[in-house]
Regions:
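Structured C-terminal subdomain patch of bacterial secreted/periplasmic proteins
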Residues: 225-232
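Residues in and immediately flanking transmembrane alpha helices
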Residues: 19, 58-59, 110, 198
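Catalytic domains of cell-wall/extracellular-matrix polysaccharide-remodeling enzymes
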Residues: 78, 102-207, 212-225
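Short, compositionally biased "basic patch" segments
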Residues: 24-27, 94-97, 138-149, 229
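Positively charged n-region of N-terminal signal peptides that target proteins for export
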Residues: 1-7
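Active-site beta->alpha N-cap acidic-glycine motif
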Residues: 24-105, 122, 216
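N-terminal entry module detector
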Residues: 5, 21-26
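Hydrophobic core
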Residues: 12-20
Length: 232
């Protein structure tokens, strides 16, 4: 009887752990879109260099393709408000890349939460309205099941990874397939890669869309009331 009780207790423990580990919704973690559709998404992380940000945005306007930017809250400057407004107005989108790019797996749950929410507050402060950062890319691509649950708890709808990460246009082109999410950063090497790569992708028949379009999300709903970080 004692043996049976121990087995039942172990089973209940395993069920509880599994339930906790998989608390986030199915499809919450994304590496690519539909492999049956010739659509891809260009993503740019960090935004350390505002000059390169402007160059990439100008390129997206010139070649008529959208970019999904995963921003660091600490790098959002008031002087860049105009370019962010233009990005949104011209079909681009903004996702969360945390406040200062830490290894989220090496900080406390509360600090990880703050990294997410402070960035939401900063983007709302810049734009003057609530722009939900429903996409998140964890720095270095590092996460745990617990962190995925945390992202879900604090308003993230999709954790977005990638399946192509090359700074050489030929290598990036060869690695790209239907549904690919391509990763770049705001530096001159990546900018010049995009200058060559985008026409190649377009000539190959790829439709370039935002990440949210690629994975079939509903249009973003903004609102007047800005988010204010409540944990100071």
């Amino acid at each position: 009887m004692k043996h049976m009780i121990r087995l039942l207790a172990l089973l209940l423990c395993l069920i509880s752990l599994t339930s906790t580990a998989l608390a986030y919704p199915a499809g919450f973690l994304v590496y690519h879109g539909d492999r049956e559709q010739k659509r891809i998404a260009i993503t740019v992380d960090d935004i350390y260099d505002a000059d390169v940000l402007r160059m990439m945005h100008d390129l997206s306007l010139e070649l008529d393709f959208p970019i999904t930017y995963f921003v660091l809250g600490a790098q959002i400057r008031d002087t860049d408000k105009e370019v962010w407004e233009s990005i949104i107005a011209n079909g681009g989108e903004i996702g969360n890349h945390t406040w200062k790019h830490p290894y989220l797996t090496e900080i406390t749950k509360h600090n990880a939460r703050n990294q997410i929410l402070l960035t939401q507050e900063r983007i709302d402060e810049l734009l003057g309205y609530h722009y939900p950062l429903r996409l998140l890319r964890p720095p270095f691509g590092k996460f745990t099941q617990e962190l995925l649950n945390l992202f879900d708890e604090y308003g993230v709808q999709k954790t977005v990874m990638w399946d192509v990460s090359y700074t050489d246009p030929q290598e990036a082109f060869k690695a790209t397939e239907n549904g690919s999410i391509l990763l770049f950063h705001t530096n001159y090497v990546d900018y010049h890669c995009l200058v060559e790569l985008i026409p190649m992708l377009q000539e190959a028949g790829y439709e370039l869309v935002t990440v949210s379009e690629l994975i079939g999300m509903e249009p973003l709903q903004t609102s007047e009331e800005k988010y204010v970080f409540p944990y100071r």
